[in-house]
Structure formats: C-alpha cells, structure tokens
Amino acid sequence: MRMRLAYKLALLTLLVAGGAVVMLAWLASTNASRLLEQEALVRLKENVNQGSIAFERSFETVKGDLSLLKHTPALGGVIRAIQGGGYDDQLNETRTGWEHRLQEVFRTVMQQRSYYSQVRLIGLQEGGRELVRLDRVGGSIEVVPAERLQQKGQRPYLQQAAMLAEEAIYFSEVTLNRERGRIVVPWEPMLRLATPVFDPQSGAVFGVLVLNIHFDRFTRPLRQKVLEDSFYLLANGRGEYLIHPQSEKRFSFEIEEREESLLLDYPQMDLQAELEHWRERDELDHEHSSTRQLKGQGVGVTLRPFYFDPLHPERYLILGTVASSQVLEQQAAGFRQQLALLVLLVV
C-alpha cells in the first residue's frame, strides 16, 4: 500500500514538473520569438542609420567639390576676361585661355566623381547663357562647343541660386532629366546643386555654378549596404519613390496617371502624421525614425528622414529598409523546435 502511494506521489511530482517544464518552454519560446522580432527590427534600424551616415558623407563630398570649383583661379580669370571685353589685364590672359583652363578643372573633378553628369558656369547676362559646360556622354567627358551653349535664365535653379549669399547652396528636387521638354530615356534622375558666383571687383552676382548629379550613380554605394532578404528605398518628402527595386514605383509623380508612394504601400504606419512631424523637425527629438513590424504584409520597415538643405531645414529625403519576415519566422520556428526537443528529453 505504501509502495503504491509512493508511486502515485512520484508520478504526480513527475507530471507537475513536466507540466512546469512545458509551460516554461512555451513561455520561453514565445518570449524568444518576440526578442527575435525586436532584434531584427533593431538591425533594420541600424542599417538605415549607417546608410544615413554614408549618405551624409556623400553630400559633404559634393558640397566640397562645389566650393573647390567656385574658388578655382580659372573661374575668377574667366570673369575678369569677360568683364574686360575678352581679356584679363590683371594676369594677361585671354577669355579663351581662361575658359580652357576652367574646362580642364571641370574635367578633373568629373573624372574623380562618376556621378557628375554635367558641370556648368552660367552667366546672368544674355538671358542666363551657359559660358562653360562639360557633359558626360557615355564613358567620355565632352566640352560643349559655344554654338551649343543654351540660355537658362528661366530655370528655377538659376533664379533661386542667384539670390543666395556667397557660400550658400541651392538644392533642387530630384527629378527625371528632360531634353526639349521630354523625359530622357533611359531615365536619368538628377539632383542639381547650384551656388552664386560673384564678380571679385564689383561684388555683384556674376552668374551661377551648377553641378548635375546622376542620382542613381550617386546612391549606388548606399544601396550596396543592404541586409540579406531586404531592400533599400529612398523617397522624397511627400513619400514618393526615388529609389525602389520595382522600377514601376519610381518617379510616379513624373508620369501621368500613376501614383506610387510609401503612404499607399504601408498604410498601417500612419505615415502622413509622421511626415508632418519630420517636417516640423523638433530639435529635441533625436530619434527621427519610424520602425514597424507589419505582420499583415510580412515585412519589417524602418524609415528615417535625411535632412540635406541648411537653407530649408524642413526639407528632407526618406531613407528606408524593408525586410521580409520569412527569415525571422524561420529562425523563430527553429528555436521553438529546439525547445520542444529539449522538453522531451527532460521529461
């Protein structure tokens, strides 16, 4: 009788212990799944933050190049020669001679940066006529001859840059390049930076120096830093795609009867409110990012604003990484299987 009671007590103890182990294993599995999800989102966020740092360096490089070009002696020589009726009395050089020197400076900079598609000096006289212009055509860099130089006086980048202070820089929207009003095919997404150039003698605005940046080439290093089973995206401040692996989603604002954006693709994130918050740019809010696991869509998404225009601090681009939940779910399932096996061995 006592032996039977002992067996029953032992069996009861075993069942209680086994149940406790199973419960603990279940709780551990659940918590582990949540931790894995959180860890994946942290990795997404870190990836976007690293991309933002790299992007900032690229912008600093471009701004440095623009400043270098602006202060090159050849540019001052061109200005003096034009103001002197074709001859620079100060250094005894013709306008043509100075223009050749400036062309070589432009060429050197373009050779160092594959994403520069065009470098120009534009004067304000004669309707904003181009004075010196180099284009990247295929694999070569070409000087545009005088008869092909154009008037750009009505272009917003020229008008707005001409009104800036000496060291200020105008940043355009990222748009598709057009020739004679038509979008160039294949597409050439362009970002234009422009800064005013002043007559050293009178102090008046003489013209504008303009860099045309091929945006796809400019962002190539950024897109190469993407995590496994994820992709980078880049959008303007309205959430419209500039960079996306699905080409049909890009630059929908340039194409009639097409609408593609972050707001439409990820409605669960309530991005309209987020965009307004980022536009206000609360300096006390150092987070400036939005990270969500969208289980209904099977993805994790991290977005953050990239502020690039000191003259207009409300302007930003949106950097983002989107990752599939499939790998995360596989990792969680494998962990649960290991726990289940451990429970069986213990019990």
Predicted regions and their residues:
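Juxtamembrane extracytoplasmic/periplasmic/luminal helical "stalk" adjacent to the first N-terminal
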Residues: L5-A10, V16-T94, Q111-Y115, P189-M190
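A short, polar/charged loop-to-alpha-helix boundary motif
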Residues: I141-L149, D216-Q224, K249-L263
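Selective detector of the "anchor" transmembrane alpha-helix that sits immediately C-terminal
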Residues: Q338-V347
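Non-catalytic regulatory/interaction regions at protein termini and inter-domain linkers
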Residues: M1-A6, L35-Q38, S289-T291, S325-Q330
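Extracytoplasmic/periplasmic ligand-binding sensor regions of membrane-associated signaling proteins
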Residues: Q111-Q112, L134-I213
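Conserved beta-strands of PAS-like sensory domains
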Residues: I183-V226, F231, G237, L242-Q246, ...
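Extracellular/periplasmic juxtamembrane segments that couple receptor/chemosensory ectodomains to their
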Residues: E260-Q338
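Short N-terminal helix-loop-first-beta-strand/juxtamembrane motif that initiates sensory/input modules
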Residues: T61-G76, T108-R136, M163-Y170, R223-K249, ...
